[in-house]
Regions:
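Bacterial N-terminal signal peptides that target proteins for export
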Residues: 2-13
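Bacterial N-terminal signal peptides
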Residues: 11-22
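ATP/NTP phosphate-donor binding region
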Residues: 25-102, 328
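Accessory alpha-helical/coil subdomains and C-terminal extensions
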Residues: 28, 34, 58, 62-69, ...
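Short Gly/Thr/Asp-enriched flexible loops that form oxyanion-binding sites at enzyme active sites
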Residues: 114-136, 278-287
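Short, acidic/small-residue loops that bind anionic groups at enzyme active sites
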Residues: 125-156, 162-166, 291-300
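Internal gly/pro-rich beta-alpha loop/helix module
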Residues: 141-212
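C-terminal non-catalytic interaction/assembly regions of soluble proteins
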Residues: 275-355
Length: 355
């Protein structure tokens, strides 16, 4: 009788453990990790070498370096692209945004983490901020050191990105970048250093928050339109209008304006001096093209501060729009999407004021 009783007790204990494990697995959030390549998937010649090949390892190899994420979430990985982010392009952006929207429309998907190279991460983050149609968390993550380096920053960043994506308080924040324990909003993000692991900043507004002990602590929210409040829909788009960024500098001429238009640009963003200013020769050339229907947006080479309307440049007279706090590279992203709807400079100006 004692043996039978012991067997029954042991059986009941095992069933209870299995039930607990199963219930625990079922309650863990479901996170998709979409990999695009970049330094975070890079492979160096040695652990101490600064040289490496971006996008050399697969999503499964990359995630195997961070087994701890399996403790906090149910993870599924997909390889969307495998490139250095200097080669990021509109085709991959559209593919990525459509896949994110497809996944987030599924009730059992709780969030998305996207691994990405840091060179153009701010552009991809902003594109997704304007085209994702969900309040569920979308977090981009990268690294400044390849996966094979001593003290690689990728694994910690990936863990923090997943931890941020599973947190209920991360919903409705817009697309975010999580690196070096900072949570950075896609509406105001810039890479500020070529080497430091703390390269990303929100230069105008400051970070949305920080990651601490695997938890997000938020200190602000974006007041700009994003995700579910965005008017842009890429569902049926297969390409985006061509927009070029040209630089103003001492003695700049109309050369790059003419080249952009001849190359098929429908819009031009000027990375101007100071408050979005440019040489008279460049301004005259752009005004001429604006009258022909080319959208012109003034931005600034300077990282901090707005490019304001109506200061030195009479935007209304010239048919220009001003980018306000959006830097030239993110301004290009917004202008491409704006041109899918209109080329009216006043309507484009509204968008640059709201996003």
């Amino acid at each position: 009788m004692k043996t039978k009783s012991l067997k029954q007790s042991l059986s009941a204990f095992i069933m209870a453990v299995l039930f607990t494990v199963t219930a625990s697995a079922q309650t863990k959030p479901n996170i998709y990790i979409l990999a695009t390549g970049g330094t975070i998937a890079g492979q160096g010649a040695s652990q101490v070498s600064s040289g490496y090949k971006a996008g050399a390892i697969s999503v499964d190899q990359m995630l195997s370096a961070v087994p701890q994420i399996m403790d906090i979430a149910t993870i599924k990985g997909e390889q969307v692209a495998q490139i250095g982010s200097q080669d990021m392009n509109n085709e991959v952006w559209l593919k990525l945004a459509k896949r994110v929207n497809e996944l987030l429309s599924q009730p059992d998907v709780d969030g998305i983490v996207i691994t990405h190279g840091t060179d153009t991460q701010e552009e991809t983050a902003y594109f997704l901020n304007l085209t994702v149609k969900s309040d569920k968390p979308v977090v981009l993550v990268g690294s400044m050191r390849p996966a094979t380096a001593i003290s690689a920053d990728g694994p910690r960043n990936i863990y923090n990105a997943v931890a941020c994506a599973i947190a209920p308080e991360s919903k409705g924040k817009g697309v975010m970048v999580v690196m070096d324990d900072k949570i950075i909003g896609a509406d105001d993000i810039a890479k500020t250093h070529t080497l430091w692991v703390s390269t990303f900043e929100d230069p105008n507004y400051g970070p949305l928050g920080i990651m601490y002990n695997g938890k997000p602590i938020y200190s602000r929210e974006s007041v700009k339109r994003h995700t579910t409040k965005s008017e842009f829909d890429i569902t049926n788009l297969t390409e985006l209008p061509r927009v070029e960024v040209i630089l103003s500098y001492s003695n700049a001429t109309e050369l790059f304006v003419d080249a952009a238009v001849k190359g098929g640009a429908k819009g031009i963003v000027v990375a101007g001096v100071g408050n979005g200013n440019m040489t008279t020769a460049m301004q005259n050339a752009l005004a001429k093209e604006a009258k022909k229907g080319i959208a012109v947006v003034r931005s600034s080479r300077i990282m901090v501060g707005p490019t304001c309307q109506w200061d030195e440049v009479d935007d209304d007279a010239l048919g220009f729009s001003a980018s306000w706090f959006i830097n030239p590279y993110r301004a290009r992203v917004l202008l491409m999407l704006a041109l899918t709807k209109t080329n009216d400079y006043k309507e484009i100006q509204r968008m640059f004021s709201e996003y």
